[in-house]
Design a protein with these regions (language model features):
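Extended ligand-binding regions for polar small-molecule ligands
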Residues: 10, 56-57, 74-147, 158-160
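Alpha-to-beta junction loops
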Residues: 2, 43-52
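Sec-exported extracytoplasmic/periplasmic mature domains
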Residues: 17-22, 43-47, 62, 101-109
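Bilobed "Venus flytrap"/periplasmic-binding protein-like clamshell domains
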Residues: 1-38, 55
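C-terminal functional modules
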Residues: 134-188
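Pocket-flanking alpha-helical
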Residues: 39-41, 56-66
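Short, well-ordered beta-strand segments
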Residues: 3-7, 50, 85
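Conserved beta-strand segments of alpha/beta enzyme cores
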Residues: 28, 69-71
Length: 188
Protein backbone atom coordinates (compact mmCIF):
# COMPACT_ATOMS: atom_id res chain seq x y z
CA UNK A 1 0.00 0.00 0.00
CA UNK A 2 0.85 3.65 -0.02
CA UNK A 3 0.84 6.35 2.61
CA UNK A 4 -1.27 9.43 1.94
CA UNK A 5 -1.07 12.76 3.76
CA UNK A 6 -4.21 14.80 4.35
CA UNK A 7 -6.01 16.99 6.89
CA UNK A 8 -7.82 15.13 9.66
CA UNK A 9 -11.59 15.44 9.95
CA UNK A 10 -12.13 17.00 6.52
CA UNK A 11 -14.16 16.04 3.48
CA UNK A 12 -10.80 15.67 1.73
CA UNK A 13 -9.96 12.82 4.11
CA UNK A 14 -13.30 11.14 3.31
CA UNK A 15 -12.95 11.72 -0.43
CA UNK A 16 -9.46 10.22 -0.37
CA UNK A 17 -10.75 7.12 1.42
CA UNK A 18 -13.62 6.72 -1.03
CA UNK A 19 -11.33 7.19 -4.04
CA UNK A 20 -8.71 4.68 -2.91
CA UNK A 21 -11.35 2.14 -1.88
CA UNK A 22 -13.18 2.46 -5.22
CA UNK A 23 -9.89 1.75 -7.04
CA UNK A 24 -8.92 -1.13 -4.73
CA UNK A 25 -5.79 0.72 -3.61
CA UNK A 26 -4.51 -0.12 -0.13
CA UNK A 27 -3.35 2.97 1.69
CA UNK A 28 -2.42 4.26 5.11
CA UNK A 29 -3.75 7.74 5.95
CA UNK A 30 -1.30 10.13 7.59
CA UNK A 31 -3.52 12.95 8.85
CA UNK A 32 -2.68 16.26 10.49
CA UNK A 33 -4.68 19.18 11.89
CA UNK A 34 -3.00 21.99 9.94
CA UNK A 35 -2.30 22.30 6.23
CA UNK A 36 1.32 23.34 6.86
CA UNK A 37 1.86 20.14 8.87
CA UNK A 38 0.50 18.05 5.99
CA UNK A 39 2.80 19.77 3.48
CA UNK A 40 5.83 19.47 5.76
CA UNK A 41 5.21 15.74 6.29
CA UNK A 42 4.78 15.12 2.58
CA UNK A 43 7.83 17.23 1.70
CA UNK A 44 9.87 15.31 4.29
CA UNK A 45 8.93 12.02 2.61
CA UNK A 46 6.58 10.73 5.31
CA UNK A 47 3.88 10.16 2.66
CA UNK A 48 3.87 8.85 -0.89
CA UNK A 49 1.07 11.19 -1.88
CA UNK A 50 -0.80 14.21 -0.57
CA UNK A 51 -4.38 15.24 -1.21
CA UNK A 52 -6.48 18.35 -0.77
CA UNK A 53 -8.39 20.67 -3.12
CA UNK A 54 -6.58 21.16 -6.45
CA UNK A 55 -6.13 24.86 -5.84
CA UNK A 56 -4.66 24.05 -2.42
CA UNK A 57 -2.30 21.46 -3.90
CA UNK A 58 -1.09 23.94 -6.47
CA UNK A 59 -0.56 26.67 -3.88
CA UNK A 60 1.07 24.39 -1.29
CA UNK A 61 3.41 22.95 -3.93
CA UNK A 62 5.09 26.35 -4.12
CA UNK A 63 6.11 25.97 -0.44
CA UNK A 64 8.03 22.74 -1.00
CA UNK A 65 11.82 22.55 -0.99
CA UNK A 66 11.88 21.45 -4.64
CA UNK A 67 8.46 22.29 -6.12
CA UNK A 68 9.45 21.15 -9.62
CA UNK A 69 9.90 17.60 -8.32
CA UNK A 70 6.18 17.36 -7.53
CA UNK A 71 3.14 17.40 -9.80
CA UNK A 72 -0.56 17.91 -9.29
CA UNK A 73 -2.22 14.91 -10.90
CA UNK A 74 -5.09 15.60 -13.31
CA UNK A 75 -7.58 13.29 -11.57
CA UNK A 76 -10.44 14.97 -9.78
CA UNK A 77 -11.66 12.84 -6.89
CA UNK A 78 -14.46 15.17 -5.80
CA UNK A 79 -16.11 18.44 -6.74
CA UNK A 80 -16.47 20.93 -3.93
CA UNK A 81 -16.72 24.45 -5.33
CA UNK A 82 -14.85 27.08 -3.33
CA UNK A 83 -15.75 30.74 -3.28
CA UNK A 84 -15.47 33.96 -1.32
CA UNK A 85 -16.66 33.96 2.28
CA UNK A 86 -17.51 36.69 4.77
CA UNK A 87 -18.21 36.70 8.47
CA UNK A 88 -21.74 36.08 9.62
CA UNK A 89 -24.01 38.94 10.58
CA UNK A 90 -23.32 41.45 7.82
CA UNK A 91 -25.82 40.58 5.11
CA UNK A 92 -25.19 43.75 3.09
CA UNK A 93 -21.45 42.99 2.86
CA UNK A 94 -22.28 39.36 2.02
CA UNK A 95 -24.52 40.55 -0.83
CA UNK A 96 -21.84 42.93 -2.15
CA UNK A 97 -19.21 40.15 -2.16
CA UNK A 98 -21.59 37.67 -3.80
CA UNK A 99 -22.69 40.15 -6.45
CA UNK A 100 -19.09 41.19 -7.12
CA UNK A 101 -18.32 37.59 -8.10
CA UNK A 102 -21.58 37.37 -10.06
CA UNK A 103 -20.60 40.58 -11.88
CA UNK A 104 -17.32 39.04 -13.02
CA UNK A 105 -19.05 35.84 -14.17
CA UNK A 106 -21.82 37.70 -16.01
CA UNK A 107 -19.30 40.03 -17.63
CA UNK A 108 -17.48 37.03 -19.09
CA UNK A 109 -20.77 35.53 -20.23
CA UNK A 110 -21.67 38.75 -22.08
CA UNK A 111 -18.18 39.29 -23.51
CA UNK A 112 -17.50 42.35 -21.36
CA UNK A 113 -13.80 42.79 -20.59
CA UNK A 114 -11.71 45.32 -18.73
CA UNK A 115 -10.78 46.77 -22.12
CA UNK A 116 -14.29 47.16 -23.55
CA UNK A 117 -16.38 47.76 -20.41
CA UNK A 118 -16.93 51.49 -20.99
CA UNK A 119 -18.11 50.93 -24.55
CA UNK A 120 -20.74 48.47 -23.31
CA UNK A 121 -22.73 51.36 -21.82
CA UNK A 122 -24.23 51.85 -25.28
CA UNK A 123 -25.06 48.17 -25.88
CA UNK A 124 -28.46 47.25 -27.29
CA UNK A 125 -28.75 44.53 -24.63
CA UNK A 126 -30.57 45.87 -21.53
CA UNK A 127 -28.92 43.24 -19.29
CA UNK A 128 -25.48 44.44 -20.32
CA UNK A 129 -26.52 48.07 -19.79
CA UNK A 130 -27.75 47.21 -16.26
CA UNK A 131 -24.52 45.34 -15.51
CA UNK A 132 -22.34 48.32 -16.44
CA UNK A 133 -24.62 50.83 -14.74
CA UNK A 134 -26.03 52.54 -17.82
CA UNK A 135 -29.59 51.53 -16.87
CA UNK A 136 -31.46 50.70 -13.70
CA UNK A 137 -30.47 51.16 -10.08
CA UNK A 138 -28.61 47.93 -9.35
CA UNK A 139 -26.22 49.44 -6.79
CA UNK A 140 -28.90 51.18 -4.72
CA UNK A 141 -29.92 47.96 -2.93
CA UNK A 142 -26.38 47.74 -1.52
CA UNK A 143 -25.89 51.44 -0.82
CA UNK A 144 -23.55 51.72 -3.81
CA UNK A 145 -23.59 53.96 -6.85
CA UNK A 146 -24.74 52.63 -10.18
CA UNK A 147 -21.26 52.11 -11.67
CA UNK A 148 -19.83 49.86 -8.94
CA UNK A 149 -20.07 46.83 -11.28
CA UNK A 150 -18.38 48.75 -14.06
CA UNK A 151 -15.46 49.61 -11.76
CA UNK A 152 -15.06 45.93 -10.80
CA UNK A 153 -14.90 44.90 -14.44
CA UNK A 154 -12.50 47.71 -15.39
CA UNK A 155 -10.18 47.09 -12.45
CA UNK A 156 -10.03 43.27 -12.25
CA UNK A 157 -11.69 42.15 -15.47
CA UNK A 158 -14.29 39.50 -16.01
CA UNK A 159 -13.94 36.10 -14.33
CA UNK A 160 -11.98 34.65 -17.26
CA UNK A 161 -9.53 37.56 -17.32
CA UNK A 162 -8.99 37.34 -13.58
CA UNK A 163 -8.55 33.54 -13.67
CA UNK A 164 -6.06 33.77 -16.52
CA UNK A 165 -3.99 36.51 -14.88
CA UNK A 166 -3.99 35.16 -11.32
CA UNK A 167 -4.15 31.39 -11.79
CA UNK A 168 -3.61 30.09 -15.33
CA UNK A 169 -0.70 32.37 -16.28
CA UNK A 170 1.09 31.54 -13.02
CA UNK A 171 1.01 27.83 -13.88
CA UNK A 172 -0.97 26.99 -10.74
CA UNK A 173 -4.01 25.56 -12.55
CA UNK A 174 -3.65 26.29 -16.27
CA UNK A 175 -6.83 24.37 -17.17
CA UNK A 176 -9.99 26.08 -15.94
CA UNK A 177 -11.88 22.79 -15.67
CA UNK A 178 -15.04 23.43 -13.64
CA UNK A 179 -14.11 27.14 -13.46
CA UNK A 180 -15.49 27.56 -16.98
CA UNK A 181 -18.82 29.16 -17.73
CA UNK A 182 -21.69 26.67 -17.75
CA UNK A 183 -21.98 27.24 -21.50
CA UNK A 184 -18.47 25.77 -21.85
CA UNK A 185 -19.02 22.78 -19.56
CA UNK A 186 -18.10 24.44 -16.26
CA UNK A 187 -20.18 25.22 -13.19
CA UNK A 188 -20.22 29.02 -13.48
Amino acid sequence: GISACTNIGTTTELNMRDFFNSKGIKYEPVAFEKADEVVAAYDAGRCDTYTTDKSGLAAQRTKMKNPDEHIVLPETISKEPLGPVVRQGDSVWEDIVRWSLNTMIEAEEYGITSANADSMKTSDNPQIKRLVGAEGEMGAAFGLDNEWNLRIIKQVGNYGESYKRNIADTGILPDRGPNQLWTKGGIL
